[in-house]
From Swiss-Prot:
The enzyme's E.C. designation: 3.1.-.-
Homology family: Belongs to the endoribonuclease YbeY family.
Cofactors: Zn(2+)
GO-annotated biological processes: rRNA processing
Protein's cellular compartments: Cytoplasm
UniProt cross-references to PANTHER family, sorted A to Z: ENDORIBONUCLEASE YBEY, CHLOROPLASTIC (PTHR46986:SF1)
Binding-site residues, Zn(2+): H105, H109, D115
A GO term, aspect molecular function: RNA endonuclease activity
Protein name: Endoribonuclease YbeY
Length: 137
């Protein structure tokens, strides 16, 4: 199965641009898209997934599950458009830029990046900045 994007909300998002950024990140990081599902949802769904699979009973911006075995990148990620909207306001950025950043972040997780420490978070943030710049120039 190839890259598939699902929007479970009523909000309109640019699925073509999101697919482009996922392919860009996976390709530039040395991977090949195998079977990736990107699910854009609301707070109710992401909270349920966070609780049922990770044991955390709260909303978050993204949850990523990687299933890589071999050369192709396989996995799925969930992004809450509700959290994206509130974070965009909080950080003073556009909804689209925050959505792109978190999509890039999720793709980086599929490529093995981690953000458990401040150093790892800083490294991921630099990669996110790199890809946002690439998309805008």
């Amino acid at each position: 199965m190839p890259l598939q994007i699902f929007n479970t909300t009523k909000r309109t998002i640019d699925e073509t641009l999101l697919a482009e950024v996922i392919r860009l990140v996976i390709g530039e990081e040395g991977g090949a898209v195998g079977s990736i599902e990107a699910i854009y949802c609301g707070n109710k769904m992401i909270r349920r997934i966070n609780r049922d699979f990770l044991g955390h009973d709260y909303v978050t911006d993204t949850i990523t599950f990687g299933y890589n075995e071999g050369g192709e990148v396989d996995g799925e990620f969930y992004i809450s458009l509700d959290v994206i909207e509130s974070n965009a306001r909080r950080f003073g950025v556009s909804f689209e830029d925050e959505l792109l950043r978190v999509t890039i972040h999720s793709a980086l997780h599929l490529m093995g990046y981690d953000d458990e420490t401040s150093e790892l978070r800083a490294a991921m943030s630099l990669r996110e900045d790199h890809y946002l710049y690439r998309l805008r120039h």
